[in-house]
Swiss-Prot record:
4'-phosphopantetheine is transferred from CoA to a specific serine of apo-DCP. The keyword Phosphoprotein applies. Belongs to the DltC family. Gene3D superfamilies: ACP-like. Residues 1-78 form the Carrier domain. NCBIfam families: dltC, PRK05087.1. Pathway: Cell wall biogenesis; lipoteichoic acid biosynthesis. This is D-alanyl carrier protein. GO terms for biological process: cell wall organization; lipoteichoic acid biosynthetic process. GO terms for molecular function: D-alanyl carrier activity. Carrier protein involved in the D-alanylation of lipoteichoic acid (LTA). The loading of thioester-linked D-alanine onto DltC is catalyzed by D-alanine--D-alanyl carrier protein ligase DltA. The DltC-carried D-alanyl group is further transferred to cell membrane phosphatidylglycerol (PG) by forming an ester bond, probably catalyzed by DltD. D-alanylation of LTA plays an important role in modulating the properties of the cell wall in Gram-positive bacteria, influencing the net charge of the cell wall. GO terms for cellular component: cytoplasm. It comes from Listeria monocytogenes serotype 4a (strain HCC23). Keywords: Cell wall biogenesis/degradation, Cytoplasm, Phosphopantetheine, Phosphoprotein.
Amino acid sequence: MAFRENVLEILEEITETDEVVQNTNIKLFDEGLLDSMATVQLLIEIEERLDITVPVSEFDRDEWATPEMIITQLEALK
């Protein structure tokens, strides 16, 4: 599975909706799909499944607002 699809799969599992796959520009926090607990879960899943460590200091809610933005941020950390 390609990197992009892996990230979207993780997001779909955490948000419990395929809306994140259908609309990769959806505002995850504004729509209530991600909150602080789900964000922690997301970072753990990214580290476990993609072997990418995201330092908490690197997490900026504005830069991680949409699935598309998350993919871009993670590609930069690979």
